[in-house]
Every structure is written in C-alpha cells, then in structure tokens.
A protein has these predicted regions:
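Active-site beta->alpha N-cap acidic-glycine motif
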Residues: 1-119, 203, 221, 235
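Short low-complexity, flexible loop/linker segments enriched in glycine and/or proline
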Residues: 58-61, 88-90, 156-160, 243-249
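A short acidic, amphipathic alpha-helical/loop segment
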Residues: 61, 129-130, 217-218
Length: 313
C-alpha cells in the first residue's frame, strides 16, 4: 500500500505537559532527521499557530521544518473543532494562521489545509462555508485516511518519563509501534472494502516525545510490511481525497472513518483493553490522562473559541 506521511502539531497544544529537556523545536528537528534517515523529504507538517501568541520564539520550529526540506500547511490558529465555531469564525481562524506562517506555507508546491482533529463539522452548510473559503484562499483540504489515536500515549509517556518507570516506558513504546502498524493495516483493509482497491493512504503522526523515540521503528516496520512512501501530492490525486464523506456528529473520526460510517461499515479503533492499559500506565498524582486533556487543553480551548464545552471520548 502507498502511504503519504504527514505530521501534525509539532508544536503541541497549550496545556500538554512535556518532560524536562523536551521542546517543540527539539521534537521538530528530531522528527525531521528521522524522516531524512528514511529518505523522506517534502513531508507536509500541519501545526496550529496559537502558541505563537504567547511565545513568538516558537516560530523557530516552523522554520526548522522548512529548513529540513519539508513543507507546511495551514491547520488553523486555535486548533478548535469546527463544531465549536461558526463557519465565519473558523474561516477567520484559518486566515489568522495564514497571517502568521503564510510566508512559509507559500514555499510548498501545493497549498494544503487540514481541519483541526480532522473534524470537518457537523453540518453540510457550515462545512460548505469553510470549503468555499478554502477554495477562495487557494487551499485544498488534506484529510487523514490512516491514524492510530497516537495522542492517547502523550500523557502516559510523560508520566513514565518523569517517574522513571522504565517498564511502563517500554510497554508504551512497544504498544505505540504495534498500534501504528496494526491500525495502518486496518485502515488499508477498510479502504479496500469501501473502494474495491488499495488507495494511497494519508497517515498522521503528531509531534510528541514518544514519536521522537519510536518513529524510526515505525517507518522500518511499515517498509517491512510492503509500504511504499509517496508524496502527499500523489496521495491527494486519488478521488477518495477529493470527495467529502457526509458530515456526522461523531468525535475524532477521520476522513476514511466517516466514509465507513456513511456506508454502515465498522470502522477501526484501538482495542479497548489496550486503550485502558495505555491511559492508566505509570500513574502520577494530578496527571490522569483524561483529566489533563480536558482540564488543561480542551476546556481552555473551548473558552478561547468562545464555545460551550462539548466533547465525547
């Protein structure tokens, strides 16, 4: 199967803790170096720009990505799901990100946008307003058609590192890699069932501490399993990435999963038992996985977006 690698949020969301010595710039450079080691250049990164408001020095991460031979797309400013904003507010948020990194986006061969969390809204009219704005701004939506819920590991890995729990750290790395491999296969199988053939998958990984420690292993496993890496531009030429599956009210469903929902076909998810093992690994007081995401990231994000908090895991 052909796979286009994309990286989201190498500058992670406000409120997400990082181990001492781990910085967005360090993560960005590490991931770029790993990609280069595997012969991958011109990889698109999509990182929201909100943290530049409080720390303009973080621009060094976006610049480092481009300097390493990769491309940038627009991922909104706030990283709020479209369902939390009106169409006009969301379009303005896209424009704000453009104002901050548009000069770097312009260096890419194609102008791509990615919806925050790949959540393209709950109504066709609102999404249509945004899609019209994207076209007028010269952007195409670059959806996600393969992921593995990698955000699930962020807080547990932080806990394992800061508590020096080497057994938990090893388990988290192993399950992260095996889930990346297993979920890619599951998404490829779903695509074959939906479209009757292999499609070039657009794969997502976030810029996290655990990604810097495992991305090379994941890419090696992909190659061993017959993956051919292709540029995002090639993957975007497939009709599955031109069309838009019907909107729905589900949370955290990617482009391919939304096709499956519309077709009434089961969609791939992490095994619930594995999910439970991961989110409870290396417990540290005050750093429960769901609580950290909700209290430190999602609820403040809703407040910044002027939205009532509305979220389902």
């Amino acid at each position: 199967v052909k796979v286009a690698v994309t990286v989201d949020d190498f500058v992670l969301w406000d409120g997400v803790p990082m181990p001492d010595g781990i910085t967005p710039l360090g993560i960005t450079k590490s991931i770029a170096a790993t990609l280069a080691d595997h012969g991958l250049t011109g990889v698109y990164g999509f990182s929201h720009t909100h943290r530049l408001d409080s720390d303009p020095g973080l621009m060094a991460a976006w610049e480092a990505w481009v300097e390493a031979g990769h491309h940038l797309g627009n991922h909104t400013h706030l990283h709020a799901p479209l369902r939390w904003m009106s169409g006009d507010q969301y379009c303005a948020d896209i424009d704000k990100a453009e104002g901050l990194i548009g000069n770097l986006i312009a260096m890419a061969p194609e102008r791509y946008f990615r919806y925050a969390m790949d959540m393209a809204g709950e109504t066709e009219s609102k999404r249509g307003r945004v899609e019209d704005h994207l076209r007028a701004s010269g952007y195409r939506n670059a959806p996600i058609t393969a992921w593995f819920g990698d955000f699930t590991w962020i807080i547990p890995y932080y806990r394992a590192v800061v508590s020096k729990d080497e057994d938990a750290k090893r388990m988290l790395q192993e399950t992260y890699v095996s889930s990346a491999v297993g979920q890619l296969a599951a998404h490829a199988q779903l695509a074959r069932r939906l479209f009757g053939q292999d499609i070039p998958l657009i794969w997502l990984i976030h810029g996290t501490a655990i990604a810097t420690d495992t991305l090379g292993t994941i890419l090696n496993a992909f190659v061993k399993n017959g993956v051919e890496f292709v540029p995002l531009q090639e993957a975007m030429s497939h009709p599955a990435h031109f069309a838009m599956p019907p909107c729905n009210s589900e949370f955290l469903r990617n482009h391919l999963q939304r096709y499956a929902i519309a077709a009434g076909i089961p969609e791939p998810h992490l095994d619930p038992e594995l999910f439970g093992r991961v989110i409870t690994a290396a417990p540290v007081e005050g750093y429960d996985t769901v609580t950290v995401f909700e209290q430190r990231m999602l609820k403040p994000l809703a407040q910044r977006a002027g939205a009532a908090y509305d979220w389902t895991w």
